[in-house]
């Protein structure tokens, strides 16, 4: 079976971890293809156990699945080992986790530069997580990065880190007045860490393509969301990689024709963390309600997420940019007990109406949402397991979102648990 891509269709935090966990039992492989530990996935098992993952694919919680950290990911060795230890301490088998030899390593100087740069920028800062993700991707593009495979050759590794530190220490000391990092200490720490994960390093491209040739199912799991994509997002308030569907092939080493389904994960309302324009953002009691009822606290940052009504403009944009075939709508249960539920169907910018994403961030920042008021429902829907179990007004809301987004809503989340899901059609169905 060809590959299936899971895409965040908004600004991240849509519930991708739950979806990967739900579908993982039907896949042989789960691959993380971009980002680093700047994003978090929360998975609630049927037992009620709650797991938070930042770097390791969500499929690690499903027995029998091989999990891959792909070449498009930037790997913080300390975070990797800490996350592995945390899983193993709770009885999770991590033996089937593999790491691409071509993934880049996130180094101490990346974190140091990221943090000091954000402080230096003041009120002009992007709002990064401060975990060094951007600087690591900068080094990758500048061809001065350290790759996972480099730890297999300590001599060559030392030369590469030495060359990098000659420049990084100049930046830290002469520009930011910070202390220089010690070469020997950086190398020694990394080699000690590498002893604990070097057995996982392999040519994951070869393995994934062989698996697809054998008819196995591969889930490609993105981090963040479409509007945080460095090319297609609300630049410059974006991440440093490509969470969109195009990045899935690039960050895993499979060809784009291998992709069978693009499943967009869409929250029933909209949230965002950090700086940047957000047309439907709420600053009233409705925003407070969504944040409290939806437990909208960032898994990685601990920051409260900004909350707003559903924005069909960005949903249509995500459908177009990713070629989304199906949607998984999450957190519909959060909207219960609202008298009306507004949906943004377009923007008004300088007196002109549009139903498409503006091409400049200044236009998006001053966009006034055009709302369509939909009737709310009061019933508790957390126990619904069939579409017909939902109140009529909740069904109407889903169908209207489906129409506006431009792709069918195949599944609906009505709670955080794996079993709190309504399946309208099989997203892994054959399309031939």
From Swiss-Prot:
* Catalysed reactions, semicolon-separated: IMP + L-aspartate + GTP = N(6)-(1,2-dicarboxyethyl)-AMP + GDP + phosphate + 2 H(+)
Which residues are listed for IMP binding in this entry? 13-16, 38-41, 129, 143, 224, 239, 303
What are the binding positions for Mg(2+) in this chain?
Answer: 13, 40
Q: Active-site residues?
A: 13 (proton acceptor), 41 (proton donor)
Give the GO cellular component terms, alphabetically: cytoplasm
Q: Which cysteine-cysteine pairs are annotated as disulfide bonds in the entry?
A: none
Among InterPro entries, the record links this protein to:
Adenylosuccin_syn_GTP-bd (IPR018220), Adenylosuccin_syn_Lys_AS (IPR033128), Adenylosuccinate_synth_dom1 (IPR042109), Adenylosuccinate_synth_dom2 (IPR042110), Adenylosuccinate_synth_dom3 (IPR042111), Adenylosuccinate_synthetase (IPR001114), P-loop_NTPase (IPR027417)
Q: Where is the signal peptide?
A: none
Q: Where does GTP bind?
A: 12-18, 40-42, 305, 331-333, 413-415
Cofactor annotation remark: Binds 1 Mg(2+) ion per subunit.
Give the EC number(s) under which this enzyme is classified: 6.3.4.4
Provide the cofactor list for this protein. Mg(2+)
Which keywords label this protein?
Cytoplasm, GTP-binding, Ligase, Magnesium, Metal-binding, Nucleotide-binding, Purine biosynthesis
Give the record's pathway: Purine metabolism; AMP biosynthesis via de novo pathway; AMP from IMP: step 1/2
Q: Which SMART domains match?
A: Adenylsucc_synt (SM00788)
State its location(s): Cytoplasm
MF term (GO), any: GTP binding
Q: Which GO terms describe its biological process?
A: 'de novo' AMP biosynthetic process; IMP metabolic process
Pfam families named in the record: Adenylsucc_synt
First-tier enzyme category under EC = ligase
- Residues bound to substrate are 299-305
Q: What does this protein do?
A: Plays an important role in the de novo pathway of purine nucleotide biosynthesis. Catalyzes the first committed step in the biosynthesis of AMP from IMP.
Q: Which family does it belong to?
A: Belongs to the adenylosuccinate synthetase family.
- Which PANTHER family does the record cross-reference, listed alphabetically? ADENYLOSUCCINATE SYNTHETASE
Which proteins does it associate with, and in what oligomeric form? Homodimer.
Protein name, please?
Adenylosuccinate synthetase
Taxonomic lineage of the native organism? Bacteria, Bacillati, Actinomycetota, Actinomycetes, Mycobacteriales
